[in-house]
Amino acid sequence: SALASASSWTIAMVVPNLSEAGCSEMFAGLQQVLQPAGYQIMLAESQHRLEQEEKLLETLLASNIAAAILLSVEHSDTVRHWLKNASIPVMEMGAMRADPIDMNIGIDNVAAMYELTEMVIQRGYQNIGLLCANQEQWIFQQHLQGWYKAMLRHHLSPNRVINAAMPPNFSTGAAQLPEFLLAWPELDALVCVSDELACGALYECQRRRIKVPDDLAVVGFGDSDVSRVCQPPLTTMAVPHRKIGIEAGKALLERLNDGDWRDHKPIASSLCLRESC
């Protein structure tokens, strides 16, 4: 039917939440490549609920889409099974996975956390802590792997870790700093898995008159908007979300034009050195 052939120019993108870090940038990168080629992206939010993602994909897969795009997050076995057996390209983007459904483009979280921790160590800090908060279990494992690798390489204790069962936001960062100082008064640097956590920790430092970076260095992850405006400006790891979107768009386009998918090297993340470390 005319509708069926028309909808095969539609690519479905399911994300947990549009306000997710870097999501709109990745979407813009995809649009930049796919729109001029005649494809429309239909965007749907699963609100971090696996059963909602299942419902959305069940509907979308029944409507003759050209391809499916997901963020590199946990998917249910049902979704993985459907997508592996669907005769369309599937792109997971954002971070590299050990077990992608099909195509996968993103940063290497292990390498990024290793590089960030290594930089803190090279600056002379030794009593370093790692603050994590609610995030995908496999991303937490990857961050932990990079952290352990850097700390153990320099024979430093990797045990100052708090994984808070709270969202990775400002208030969690502010609430967890006292916990670190209570457990490890010798703490001289804090690595945070998001800029929001790091900025929350900075607010708490100001409240307690802890000088950053003289008394305590703080670094974040993501190079979000807030990292440039907090006081002092935050040293962080930049994730090139738009580039990830562009590369994912190009790879999808090639595949849709009957090209092959060759495993893609991770997209490099880069250190942003500012005043907090």
Regions found by a protein language model. Give the residues of each.
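Amphipathic helical "hinge" segments at domain boundaries
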Residues: 1-67, 145-148
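Short beta->alpha connector loops
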Residues: 47-50, 71-76, 196
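Residues that cap or initiate secondary-structure elements
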Residues: 17-19, 47, 74, 243, ...
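Bacterial carbohydrate/catabolite-sensing allosteric modules
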Residues: 29-40, 55, 61, 77, ...
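Redox-cofactor binding/interface segments in oxidoreductases and associated redox assembly factors
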Residues: 13, 70, 192
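Flexible glycine-/small-residue-rich
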Residues: 15, 72, 94
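Short, flexible loop segments at the rims of nucleotide/cofactor-binding pockets, characterized by
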Residues: 45-48, 67-70, 106-108, 167-169
